[in-house]
Amino acid sequence: LVGLATHFYGADSDKDNLGQKLPPLWAKFLPRLGEIANTVPGVCYGVVAPAGPHTEELRYLACIEVSGPGPLPPGMEAMEIPASTYARFTHRGPAQNVDATVNYIYSSWLLSASQSHSLGPDLEIYGSQYHPTSADSVMHYAIPITQAGR
């Protein structure tokens, strides 16, 4: 994956600045897609992971998959995500409402599932059905999982 990164605080934090950080990051990244070598077209990703231990700050990478290494455009970085099993959820509706889907995953589904979060990065998956402000928009949110107790 190759893209632009930022740090932010999520909706569950008193320091929530998601709305100030992520839309401008995507606004900078999308016009620069043509600068990235070896892209796999059709899907962009948002990669969400803790910024470090013992912090509620999160690190976010707005990115696209690449088929192989190439020169990194200025200010961009490459990231490889190890293979993992993911639980994938569909979010329908405007992007501004995705927090409801994420809250469901973490406060309902994960608590009753036989799996647990494997502590890898979460993925936002933006394909051709994604239209940020449309009520008909579709995107996916995926969390890495492992069987509970492992």
Residue ranges of each PLM-predicted region?
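A solvent-exposed interaction/effector surface
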Residues: 1-150
